[in-house]
A protein has these predicted regions:
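Active-site glycine-centered loops adjacent to acidic/histidine catalytic or metal-binding residues
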Residues: 9, 104, 126
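Short alpha-helical oligomerization interface
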Residues: 19-24
């Protein structure tokens, strides 16, 4: 199984902070949000990860060079046409199952059970 993680957005609601730091790299509990996401999915056995980058994408690449538990592929979304477009750009159109995870959201999901499901599954968590 591979994962697609879209992290191309500008994070306009977090400006001016996102003018200099990609929002998936904002620190939460001592490490970037993206690191929390990567830790959760690699613990579930996902190692092949495609990141859809755009705004400040070089920062995401630099961070991933320091992360040792995964194999990364980067796809640049040059035209911002929404989340669906970003995910579509990351698909390789193989029959391999794909886990799509947002790179700027820390969710308490059981990724092991989600991955083991024989059905297409949507993981949804309430936002307080």
């Amino acid at each position: 199984m591979k994962a697609i993680i879209p992290v191309a957005g500008h994070g306009t609601r977090l400006e001016p902070h996102t003018l200099t730091l990609q929002k998936c790299l904002f620190p939460v509990a001592g490490k970037p949000v993206l690191e929390h996401v990567l830790d959760r999915i690699t613990e579930a056995g996902v190692r092949d990860i495609t990141l859809i980058i755009g705004h400040l994408g070089h920062q995401v690449k630099d961070f991933c060079l320091t992360y040792e538990n995964a194999n990364f592929t980067f796809v640049e979304q040059t035209e911002r046409l929404g989340l669906g477009h970003a995910v579509y750009q990351g698909l390789d159109h193989s029959d391999e199952p794909v886990l799509i995870v947002l790179g700027d959201a820390i969710l308490e999901l059981d990724y092991n059970n989600l991955i083991k499901s024989q059905y297409s599954t949507i993981g949804v968590a309430p936002v307080p």
